[in-house]
Amino acid sequence: GAGPAWESAIRSAAVDDGFLARNLPMDEAHVGWFLTLDPENPSSIRRCLECARSNGRAVRTSLTLETWEAVNDAWHEVQRFGTTIPDSTTLVRIADTIKDALLMFDGAAHRTQLREATYWFLRLGTTVERADNTARLLDVKYHLLLPRTEPVGGSLDYFQWTTLLRTVSALTAYRWVYRESVKPWLVADLLIFNRAMPRSLIACLEDAVWLLDQLAASRGRRGPANRIAANSLRALANSNIDTLFQSGLHEFLVEFVGENNRLGNAIAEQYLF
């Protein structure tokens, strides 16, 4: 059905302008198709896998057989779904297929790739994208998702924060770290400041700084990307969740996404992508 949940899915993927330009209904069938199988949406899963496969072919000799097969198999799996999504069950199957494929790719790269530039660039791209995704998901939930008629801390609010944790595979981690019911400020603390949480913003920045350091050491020079990543990490390390809520979590997340985009552009320019 239609509703804020599907609008939030579009916004968290940062494709709301593209979706609205197509004049499609904001419902499960159309949003699900747009985000997964739409060949005209450059951010759809289908298009992302096509790009990944094309890029993989271009650097095929630097990928292990296992890493290449993980990418190629994922592309073939999605192709089998065709171009339409007949029902909710199919949408769930697509999502599960992609999650399995991503885990397979991560595992193959981690276990088989040489620790040199190819691997570091793979991890760096993942890290920048992960930080962007975490920040956008947090902002959508905090700033947009709860209807004005619903109370903060009510059953719907609790359900939505729990769903967010499930979305980023962090519900078990949350319970392990905080050992209490789901609270918005603790979810934000986990996904922003907890260094042990792999997809937290600070963990992503630490990874980015380390990976850029490895590339700098191997290539003999540092550049703007190293400075941007280090400055962003330093600023976040000197803050805390209380400060962010007082100054405005939404404003912080918008600024973080912008700075993260600047980092991505600096990496592309520094290494001539």
Residue ranges and their predicted role:
Residues 1-273:
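Alpha-helical transmembrane segments and their helix-helix packing motifs
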